[in-house]
Amino acid sequence: MNERKKVTVPDLGRWRESGRRISMITAYDAMFARIVDEAGVDVILVGDSVGMVVQGHSNTIPVDLGEMVYHTRNVARAGTKALVVGDLPFGSYQASSQQAVESSIALTKAGAECVKLEGGVHVADAIAAITRVDIPVMGHIGLTPQSFHRMGGHKVQGRVEGYEAGSRNRLLEDAYAVEQAGACAVVIEGVPMELATEITMKVGIPTIGIGAGNGCNGQVLVLHDVLGLSDSNLKFVKHYADLRRTSISAVKQYVDEVSTGAWPDADHSFT
């Protein structure tokens, strides 16, 4: 059996051209990075979703750059064959293109092989600036979690006509802007599948969907949702296992054995 090759940024474009679909999943530490890499995932996203999944926040806004550097470094230590993408958190690129470059350098030094940021037209200058220092950028349009307050929550985008933020025509403009600014790929989140498919057909870079139907060049999900560790019931989430229930059962058994004195037994004790 041939050893799996390291995934690189140019691979994403080649796979789009050949029709090979791209799998991306989140990980925030070395242990889970190794697990998803062994499963054969193409891209590991060190997402600012860590704020909700691990830290217990109701949205991603509180996550800061230092935290993303920490988690990116942990994932990078796993030495995965999968491409490692680091999320630029809210407040780390909005102030200026210079800030965006400096934040991207910090994530790259931590081990990110590509950075991701949210937005379209209004972040095109930041994307262009980051790519000028040879750091690959992945865009993210549609339901952008860092725009939680403007959207009034995590709401599907692109259902209305017009050119205002979140409208169908604006999302098409956002996709073009991200591509023209030099992004190597773009995540499309929380939009009608027909629109995501149209965007995929009209842009020349890979699209990776989440809650955007099956017409994108790839898909991304949060690992904790895939494993059934979360209790998310979002329409676009699929639990491929029920590790939450399994984990509760295992810990309960441990608690019971401690309380009865059954643990540790002779086989797990030194003489």
What kind of feature is each model-predicted range?
Residues 2-271:
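Alpha/beta enzyme core
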